[in-house]
């Protein structure tokens, strides 16, 4: 199958995330592939219709649904109407070329449309097989590099209309040489991590072998710990989050008591470490979420429970909900009455409550004076 390689350089809120490389099925759907290729290179210049560059550059992924797809390619509509625009290199719309290829696996490129023969520039990347789209949307390529970036996008926080809260942007795009060799799946990202973003995307992990899964999670967790010790907090949090996602996606049956104990221990360690790093990064909501996950682990011991409660309470201080922080830190103090860090956190929560109430009293007094 003839396949032109093209790429997106993806950023999230201005922070580079990496490169996603696609191969286009030129010989199966040449017209559709040529449209996407030109919108990557921008070689058609300015649209006489919209006055916008015929290019994906600086456009965002406006609709993302976990376990389904990531959609983008609308570079003509205003920000509050994304998903209603887009334009092909042939004019506004063009016909469905053919439906020879099916949506039978994740990481396929397919045309978004509003009905038969309404293809423009909008596209989507599948993240699971989507056979219900066969015969309705034209498959024209697939991801051959950067699958982990697609997975991060897929799992990003969403707001209204399934739009990512943060702007996942195509910061740059273009065409690669015909003989381009994609970076091998699971290539080291510079930290020693050679695993895909999602557990089931790995060819090197036997999902039916608990020891294989535990070894991968432990390796990712250890990389997170090393990065934490080096002061690389963002990268450390990224690795703990990745380890957590592996555990959240793992639903084994019939584990031995020993394997169950290992699973629970890994969950506790990863969740608690994620909460710790989130606090260091001043990410209160993330710290609370990670601590809550730790508290839900079966057979949690008192020492771990105390840590989780403390980190949850400090997370609430960061989000300025000191009343909730006080309640949780008091619960932690009951488990460990002599813990200086908990005592200090509780004092901070009470002090902040007093400051806010004093400020409110002054404001009310001024209002009625």
UniProtKB/Swiss-Prot annotation:
This is Peptidyl-prolyl cis-trans isomerase D. It comes from Candida albicans (strain SC5314 / ATCC MYA-2876). PROSITE patterns: CSA_PPIASE_1, CSA_PPIASE_2, TPR, TPR_REGION. GO terms for cellular component: cytoplasm; intracellular membrane-bounded organelle. GO terms for biological process: protein folding; protein refolding. The lineage of its organism: Eukaryota, Fungi, Dikarya, Ascomycota, Saccharomycotina. Belongs to the cyclophilin-type PPIase family. PPIase D subfamily. It is an enzyme of class 5 (isomerase). Keywords: Cytoplasm, Isomerase, Repeat, Rotamase, TPR repeat. The keyword Ribonucleoprotein does not apply. It comes from the Eukaryota. Gene3D superfamilies: Cyclophilin-like, Tetratricopeptide repeat domain. It catalyses: [protein]-peptidylproline (omega=180) = [protein]-peptidylproline (omega=0). Transmembrane segments: none annotated.
């Amino acid at each position: 199958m003839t396949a032109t390689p093209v790429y997106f350089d993806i950023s999230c809120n201005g922070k580079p995330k990496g490169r996603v490389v696609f191969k286009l099925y030129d010989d199966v759907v040449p017209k559709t592939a040529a449209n996407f290729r030109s919108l990557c290179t921008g070689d058609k210049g300015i649209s006489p219709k919209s006055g916008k560059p015929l290019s994906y550059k600086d456009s965002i992924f406006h609709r993302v649904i976990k376990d389904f797809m990531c959609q983008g390619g609308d570079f003509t509509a205003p920000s509050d109407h994304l998903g209603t625009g887009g334009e092909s290199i042939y004019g506004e719309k063009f016909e469905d070329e053919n439906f020879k290829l099916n949506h039978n696996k994740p990481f396929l490129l397919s045309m978004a449309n509003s009905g038969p023969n309404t293809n423009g520039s909008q596209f989507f990347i599948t993240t699971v097989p989507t056979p219900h789209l066969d015969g309705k949307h034209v498959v024209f390529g697939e991801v051959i590099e950067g699958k982990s970036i697609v997975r991060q996008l897929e799992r990003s926080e969403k707001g209204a209309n399934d739009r990512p809260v943060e702007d996942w942007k195509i910061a740059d795009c273009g065409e690669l040489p015909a003989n381009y060799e994609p970076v091998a799946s699971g290539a080291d990202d510079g930290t020693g991590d050679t695993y895909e973003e999602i557990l089931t995307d790995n060819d090197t992990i036997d999902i039916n072998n608990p020891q294989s899964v535990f070894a991968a999670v432990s390796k990712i967790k250890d990389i997170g710990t090393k990065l934490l010790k080096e002061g690389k907090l963002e990268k450390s949090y990224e690795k703990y989050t990745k380890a957590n996602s592996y555990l959240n996606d793992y639903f084994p049956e019939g584990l031995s008591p020993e394997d169950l104990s290992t699973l629970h221990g890994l969950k506790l360690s990863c969740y608690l470490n994620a909460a710790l790093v989130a606090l260091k990064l001043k990410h209160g909501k993330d710290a609370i979420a990670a601590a809550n996950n730790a508290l839900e682990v079966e057979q949690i011991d008192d020492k771990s429970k105390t840590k989780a409660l403390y980190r949850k309470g400090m997370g609430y201080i960061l989000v300025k909900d000191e009343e909730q922080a006080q309640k949780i830190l008091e619960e932690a103090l009951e488990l460990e009455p002599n813990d200086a860090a908990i005592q200090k956190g509780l004092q901070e929560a009470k002090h902040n409550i007093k400051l806010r109430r004093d400020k409110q009293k002054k404001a009310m007094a001024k209002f009625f004076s």
